[in-house]
C-alpha cells in the first residue's frame, strides 16, 4: 500500500499556486479554506504548538488567510468543494489502475471545518469516507483503505463506520505502550489499552506498528506516561519534538538485536495486523 495525503498539499503545489492567484469565491480559490477573520474555527487546537502560532497564515498574493492544521507550508484542502472530492477520487483511480493495493489515508480526522467545534472527527468526514469507500468498491477489486487517525481507540474506531468506511485503522495508543511495557518489564500498559479498545466490525481490523515516518508520537498517553517515555527513550533533548520522540527503531532499542527482535515478536503476537514501514524493516 502507499501513502495518500488528502487533507492538505504543499504550498508549492500547482493547485495552491493557482488558488492564491484566483479571485475570491472562484472555482480554483475554493480548493482551499480562506478567511479574513482569524477567529474563525477558534476552537480547533494547534497541533504543532512548538512551531505554529496559529492554524491561519496570511498569504500576500491572495490577500487572505489560509487554513492549515499542520505546518504553514501545508495548506488544507477544502472538502466542502465537490471538485476537491472528485480530484481525490481521480487520484485514487489513477494509482489503483497502476496496481496499488491500497492507501494509507493521512490525517483523516481533519478533512472538514465547522465553527463551534474542534474541527476533528466531524460527521461530514464520515459521510465523505463512506462516499470514498463506495467509489473504490464500485470501481476496483480488493483495494484497502487504512485510516491514520491519531486518537484514543473509542474515537478512532469511528473510522471503520459500520464496515463501510476504512477497512483498517492504526491503533496509535498501543504503539508507545509496547515500548513502555518492554522497558518496565510489565504487561500492564499494553493490557490496559487493549481493555479500552472497543469491538469493531468483523470485516475490519486494527493496524499495529512500532515506528513510522513521523516522530514516535506521545499524544495518546497520560502526562505521567509521557514523562516516563521522555526519561527512558530521549535522554538527548534534541530527540524531543512537539509531543513525541524523533528516533528510529534501532537507536530507541540501543541498536541491540535482541531487543529489536523482542519488539517485533511482541508486535506480531498482539491482536491486529502488523504494519511495517518500508525503511524500518531492517534498522
Spans of model-derived segments:
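Active-site and adjacent substrate-binding regions of carbohydrate-active enzymes
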Residues: 1-281
Amino acid at each position: 500500500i502507499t501513502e495518500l495525503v488528502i487533507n492538505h498539499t504543499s504550498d508549492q503545489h500547482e493547485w495552491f499556486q493557482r488558488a492564491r492567484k484566483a479571485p475570491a469565491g472562484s472555482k480554483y480559490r475554493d480548493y482551499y479554506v480562506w478567511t479574513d477573520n482569524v477567529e474563525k474555527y477558534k476552537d480547533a487546537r494547534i497541533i504543532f504548538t512548538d512551531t505554529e502560532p496559529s492554524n491561519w497564515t496570511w498569504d500576500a498574493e491572495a490577500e487572505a488567510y489560509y487554513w492549515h492544521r499542520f505546518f504553514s507550508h501545508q495548506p488544507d484542502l477544502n472538502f466542502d468543494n465537490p471538485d476537491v472530492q472528485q480530484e481525490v477520487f481521480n487520484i485514487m483511480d489513477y494509482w489503483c489502475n497502476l496496481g496499488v493495493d491500497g492507501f494509507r489515508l493521512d490525517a483523516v480526522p481533519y478533512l472538514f471545518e465547522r465553527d463551534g467545534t474542534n474541527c476533528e472527527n466531524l460527521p461530514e468526514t464520515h459521510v465523505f469516507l463512506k462516499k470514498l469507500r463506495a467509489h473504490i468498491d464500485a470501481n476496483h477489486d480488493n483495494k484497502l483503505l487504512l485510516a491514520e487517525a491519531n486518537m484514543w481507540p473509542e474515537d478512532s474506531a469511528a473510522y471503520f463506520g459500520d464496515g463501510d468506511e476504512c477497512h483498517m485503522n492504526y491503533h496509535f495508543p498501543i504503539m508507545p505502550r509496547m515500548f513502555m511495557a518492554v522497558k518496565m518489564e510489565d504487561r500492564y500498559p499494553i493490557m490496559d489499552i487493549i481493555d479500552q479498545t472497543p469491538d469493531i466490525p468483523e470485516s475490519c481490523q486494527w493496524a499495529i506498528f512500532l515506528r513510522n515516518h513521523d516522530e514516535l508520537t506521545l499524544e495518546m498517553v497520560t502526562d505521567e506516561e509521557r514523562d516516563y517515555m521522555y526519561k527512558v527513550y530521549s535522554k538527548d533533548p534534541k530527540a524531543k519534538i512537539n509531543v513525541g520522540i524523533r528516533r528510529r527503531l534501532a537507536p530507541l532499542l540501543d541498536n541491540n538485536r535482541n531487543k529489536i527482535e523482542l519488539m517485533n515478536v511482541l508486535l506480531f503476537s498482539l491482536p491486529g495486523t502488523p504494519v511495517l514501514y518500508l525503511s524500518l524493516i531492517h534498522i
